[in-house]
Amino acid sequence: MKILIITVAGTSSRFSESLGKDCLKCIYYKNNIKESLLYRMIYQNTDFDCYVIVGGFMYDELNQVIENDFSELKKKIILVKNSYFREYGSGYSLYLGLKAIINMEFSQVVFAEGDLYVDKESFERLCELKTNVITCNDEAILASKAVAFYYDVNYGIHYIYDVSHNVLEIREPFTGIFNSGQIWKFVSSDKLKESFFSLNEVEWQGTNLVFIQRYFERLKREEYTMIRFKKWINCNTISDFERI
């Protein structure tokens, strides 16, 4: 079984502010639903057996859109409600998404943050690969908005991010640094489950990078592939969305 998890629970505060009204950015469009980030992500590749969508902010509106505009995939979609989207970090949405499928038999899980637009060619390649995948993009690494990862001298992966968007700090020698593409692929169900159950309640309430770090630190360099997106847009504002 192939599973895609998309987390869209956040309040979209910067997007709503730029638009002048409350809006769940993953379902925003100007002319039709096919322009929305959620539609674009799901229809990048419809070969998944299951789509897990974790919502929170404007959950009823999300549910209605799925009922009305994703009816042909409705049997494949699991919609999960995150009631703590204001109190907890992004890790809790990932926790709920993984919890929904943790007892299933799966061969691969792709996890994507729901505010992204990426090029179809790169995403399809990610889906076709039989290995674990981390992703990066070509944007400048700025503390004000970037999630970065670097390789230490032994090619171990380390993710770095400042929730206050002030500074990024690396306190050890490193061999490379990249701007994260915020989409990952997991092909080891055993390591995924080990990583899932190894985190405590407080850790899950932080960022989703805690789980990502826990999973990929269990892998050797030859056990994963890195894909660089040819086009990658993190749609924080309406101006970002209009770049698509």
Residue ranges and their predicted role:
Residues 40, 61, 95-96, 125, ...:
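Alpha-helical elements of Rossmann-like donor-binding domains used by nucleotide-donor carbohydrate transfer enzymes
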Residues 119-203:
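Conserved core of the sugar-phosphate nucleotidyltransferase
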Residues 3, 49-52, 76, 108, ...:
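Residues at the starts of beta-strands that form the adenosine-phosphate
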Residues 10, 115, 237:
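Active-site glycine-centered loops adjacent to acidic/histidine catalytic or metal-binding residues
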